[in-house]
């Protein structure tokens, strides 16, 4: 309703940044629950109290479904496909209750848009609504349609870990944790039954599974046993928060100094690999919000490109790959306001990076077996670690 939209707009204006809008906003007549993804707010209007996580999880599922349907989830894409968006939402929510949230089933009910289908619909006045009931909706495994056939049978799994860390100025870890996911792309004929086992499943805590995973089997044997959905899906997400299990893959050596009364400051940082099991760190970027008193910076990088914005005071350095034999460094001077006292605290350094073929937690897949079908599928597992919120204090 317009009224709810107005109340949400007010909450947006009160928050300094989009990320600071409260996920649950009580108003006189209802609750507004929202998630912020792809620079868009997705808002649910609730008339009576329900567990907020239930609604927030549903909103995330809506966003994932749009991404699956349209390739990207953006304001333009939603406007361009507004009819399909409404058709999908009609199936996902039935009279205010979540109904079909499984991408496989939705695609049988509402065909994803293609250029050809859009042209045909425009000419003939037809819609994307499927002409038959989905076979999976009525079966024991509602996430998988029946009669799936492929000429090439393959199952790929991506283990992706994101590391959040705060490192203090002496290089000690203040906090560190890993958020991990296993994303799957399974294209197998028939009704395959898969089991996936790990070398070291005990290091996973706080695990959440796709509904296809047999939970009892995980509880008793720490093995993932499941009949997979067809196509792309998230098999599980997990958390590793035990400090002793989180290896820190990079270090930053820094010498950033300001002197009282001096109009020059010193700035030196070097980035190097730490516990990377011999894997290359790539896609490295360094950014730092400099104090207000810094007017300009004169820096020389040993590699990559850097930029300092004298208005926003943001320093960005695009480093690229780290070569352990020749560590990347950025050195030089800072021009400060004349006569200004030195800043209260030194800037924080934010890092982004990627490491291919490494799960930083040490998680390793042991084997993948298939039952219930006779053919030999092609199997592949990839690992990747990337930085989430990774901060070094100086």
Which residues are covered by each model-predicted region?
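Intrinsically disordered, low-complexity Ser/Thr/Pro/Gly-rich interaction regions
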Residues: 110, 120-394
């Amino acid at each position: 309703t317009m009224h709810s939209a107005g109340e949400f707009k007010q909450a947006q204006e009160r928050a300094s940044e989009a990320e600071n809008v409260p996920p649950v906003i009580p108003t006189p007549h209802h609750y507004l629950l929202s998630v912020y993804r792809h620079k868009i707010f997705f808002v649910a209007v609730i008339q009576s109290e329900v567990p907020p996580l239930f609604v927030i999880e549903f909103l995330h599922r809506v966003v994932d479904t749009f991404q699956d349907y349209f390739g990207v989830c953006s304001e333009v894409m939603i406007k361009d496909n507004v009819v399909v968006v409404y058709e999908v939402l009609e199936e996902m929510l039935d009279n205010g209750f979540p109904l079909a949230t499984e991408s496989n089933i939705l695609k049988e009910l509402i065909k994803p848009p293609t250029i050809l289908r859009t042209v045909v619909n425009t000419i003939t006045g037809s819609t994307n609504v499927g002409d038959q009931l989905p076979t999976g909706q009525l079966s024991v495994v509602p996430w998988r349609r029946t009669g799936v056939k492929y000429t090439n049978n393959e199952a790929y799994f991506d283990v992706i870990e994101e590391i959040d860390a705060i490192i203090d100025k002496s290089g000690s870890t203040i906090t560190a944790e890993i958020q991990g996911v296993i994303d799957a792309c399974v294209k197998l004929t028939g009704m395959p039954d898969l089991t996936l086992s790990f070398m070291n499943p005990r290091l996973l805590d706080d695990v959440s599974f796709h509904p296809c995973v047999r939970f009892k089997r995980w509880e008793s044997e720490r093995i993932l046993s499941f009949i997979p959905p067809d196509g792309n899906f998230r098999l599980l997400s997990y958390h590793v928060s035990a400090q002793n299990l989180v290896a820190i893959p990079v270090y930053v050596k820094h010498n950033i100094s300001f002197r009282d009364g001096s109009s020059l400051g010193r700035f030196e940082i070097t980035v190097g690999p730490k516990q990377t099991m011999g894997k290359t760190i790539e896609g490295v970027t360094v950014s730092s919000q400099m104090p207000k008193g810094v007017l300009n910076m004169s820096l020389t990088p040993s590699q990559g490109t850097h930029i300092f914005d004298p208005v926003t005071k943001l320093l960005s350095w695009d480093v690229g790959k780290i070569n352990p034999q020749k560590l990347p460094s950025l050195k030089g001077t800072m021009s400060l306001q004349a006569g200004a006292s030195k800043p209260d605290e030194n800037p924080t350094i934010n890092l982004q990076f990627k490491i291919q073929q490494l799960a930083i937690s040490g998680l390793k897949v042991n084997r993948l077996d298939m039952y219930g079908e006779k053919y030999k599928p092609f199997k592949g597992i990839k690992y990747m670690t990337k930085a989430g919120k990774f901060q070094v204090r100086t």
